[in-house]
From Swiss-Prot:
Its EC number is 3.1.3.16. Mn(2+) 1 binds at D117, G118. Disulfide bonds: none annotated. It comes from Arabidopsis thaliana. This is Probable protein phosphatase 2C 24. It catalyses: O-phospho-L-seryl-[protein] + H2O = L-seryl-[protein] + phosphate; O-phospho-L-threonyl-[protein] + H2O = L-threonyl-[protein] + phosphate.
């Protein structure tokens, strides 16, 4: 994954021209691209292993005719961009796991995508990136056609993730972590989680917090999640019913602290802040793409604009060719994700911005 880090050039950094002018002596932004080799290697290896497993599961007698079948079992194209933006620290995390699970009664794999927006520190978001897809995989049953089964699976996975984070937090504090200044350590650390499991015929989205999933269908946005804000009427009733309060402090906050009503972690705000996700199951039709992103994007870019940008990039990139390597992240999706993060920064987003664009065209 290429991460664009936002940093500040000080007087100690060399400048090309006009160093002495007042306008150029001020602190100014500079963008630096950093390639995460481990991310690239892990993604490529996981895709190659998944493809090898999928191919080996096909009976030998039918392998020769596999390319002539009309069913596309390849992993969907995707693009990822994660930027630090104007924040001092990067607290977002992204998880991409193509073909992370194959139901026993089907040869077609399922694909996992997730965006986690941490707050207080990066511990919980990082832990979700490492563990949540594994918990979902463990909770999946052989037959997931029933919507209630999907909802139960996601709810159990998020609950297990939350319990892991609470019990695991005490052991992750390091000398360089700002959690050192908190007592008890990491109790005020949490993360949003918006994840999607894509099957050949369904799009399953589970959301906890104010990250968002938006489907672009026939050029129009279809929100697949609803932000969990403390002033949302049903969330306000739930918080007050549990004995909590929503206090306005530059925006509605739970007990005047947290600007979202659901999250993984945040042990000190329980039970007012819930880890229970809202789950939607959508049948795949004439879909263009799915966008998962943290609120660093959605705070300044509307659903309509995001879909227009992504669709424009996808239409310019064309469709996957028969001889194209499906294990390579698609250039058009990557361009869409990068363009969306640049747009968010151009509109003065003050948060980390993480965007995943998944091509759903058949």
């Amino acid at each position: 994954m290429a991460e664009i880090c936002y940093e500040v050039v000080t007087d100690a950094c060399p400048s090309s021209v006009y160093e002495s002018t007042p306008a150029h002596s001020r602190r100014r932004p500079r963008f630096q691209t950093v390639m995460h080799e481990d991310w690239e290697k892990n993604c490529k290896r996981s895709k190659q292993e998944a493809l090898a497993t999928r191919y080996s599961s096909i009976p030998r007698s039918s392998r020769e005719d596999f390319s002539d079948q009309n069913v596309d079992v390849s992993s969907p194209r995707y693009g990822v961009s994660s930027v630090c933006g104007r924040r001092r620290e990067m607290e977002d995390a992204v998880a991409i796991h193509p073909s992370f699970s194959s139901p026993k009664n089907s040869e077609f794999p399922q694909h996992y995508f997730g965006v986690y927006d941490g707050h207080g520190c990066s511990h919980v978001a990082a832990r979700c990136r490492e563990r949540l897809h594994k918990l979902v995989q463990e909770e999946l049953s052989s037959d997931m056609e029933d919507e209630e089964e999907w909802k139960t699976t996601m709810e159990r996975s998020f609950t297990r993730m939350d319990k892991e984070v609470v019990s695991w937090g005490d052991s992750v504090v390091t000398a360089n972590c700002k959690c050192d200044l908190q007592t008890p350590a990491c109790d005020s650390v949490g993360s949003t989680a918006v994840v999607s499991v894509i099957t050949p015929d369904k799009i399953v989205v589970a959301n906890c917090g104010d990250s968002r999933a938006v489907l672009c269908r026939n050029g129009k946005p279809v929100p697949l999640s609803t932000d969990h804000k403390p002033d949302r009427p049903d969330e306000l009733d739930r918080i007050e019913g549990a004995g909590g309060r929503v206090i306005y402090w530059d925006c509605p906050r739970v007990l005047g602290v947290l600007a979202m009503s659901r999250a993984i972690g945040d042990n000190y705000l329980k039970p007012y802040v819930s880890c229970e996700p809202e789950v939607t199951i959508t049948d795949r039709r004439d879909d263009d793409c799915l966008i998962l992103a943290s609120d660093g994007l959605w705070d300044v870019v509307s659903n309509e604009t995001a879909c227009s940008v992504a669709r424009m990039c996808l239409r310019g990139g064309g469709r996957r060719q028969d001889n194209e390597d499906p294990a390579i992240s698609d250039k058009a999706c990557t361009e869409a994700s990068v363009l969306l993060t640049k747009l968010a920064l151009a509109r003065n987003s003050s948060d980390n911005v993480s965007v995943v664009v998944i091509d759903l065209r058949r």
